[in-house]
């Protein structure tokens, strides 16, 4: 029964309690993916970006959250809303190696391009590493993809910076450009 003192966790569909941030379901599996994310943040370069891709419900956001929880001593990490006011991002002062995670890139490429530029400038002259991790369903770089639209939304300088700073590019293939979350196998569950 609901009273005035009961926290309302219901949304329009009654599923708010299952949102990844609630951590209602125990995180399981994805050891290899967590290790790949750890390698991403530990790489020697000062600025790198990468993406985690997979179908809706594959666990991209939960994986990123779990990674931040397990690695919080190594770097400062946070989810950054693509709709953040650019002035808020400009006020950020780097104080540690940092991982910024942006979910839902498709349709928000212009806003995210601005965020990239500001963060690149913020970290370019300091001693701290910057990692940007994008979460998106689509795993392609073809014309019209979120990747293509994001890169072309950037000013030429930042476009070159991002082209040079894509993590694991030398190991990628056309079908596996980014960290792709496939279905969990039975052993992982």
Description of each model-found segment:
Residues 1-123, 128-141, 146-166, 173-181:
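Walker A/P-loop phosphate-binding element recognition
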């Amino acid at each position: 029964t609901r009273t005035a003192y009961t926290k309302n966790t219901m949304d329009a569909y009654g599923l708010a309690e299952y949102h990844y941030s609630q951590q209602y379901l125990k995180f399981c599996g994805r050891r290899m993916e967590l290790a790949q994310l750890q390698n991403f943040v530990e790489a020697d370069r000062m600025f790198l970006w990468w993406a985690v891709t997979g179908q809706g419900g594959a666990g991209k956001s939960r994986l990123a959250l779990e990674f931040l929880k397990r690695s919080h001593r190594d770097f400062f990490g946070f989810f950054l809303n693509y709709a953040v006011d650019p002035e808020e991002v400009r006020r950020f002062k780097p104080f540690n190696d940092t991982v910024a995670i942006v979910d839902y890139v498709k349709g928000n490429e212009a806003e995210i391009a601005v965020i990239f530029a500001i963060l690149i400038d913020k970290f370019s002259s300091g001693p701290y590493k910057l990692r940007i991790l994008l979460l998106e369903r689509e795993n392609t770089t073809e014309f019209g993809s979120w990747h293509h639209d994001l890169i072309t939304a950037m000013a030429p300088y930042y476009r070159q910076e991002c082209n040079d700073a894509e993590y694991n590019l030398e190991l990628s293939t056309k079908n596996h450009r980014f960290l792709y979350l496939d279905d969990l196998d039975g052993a992982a569950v």
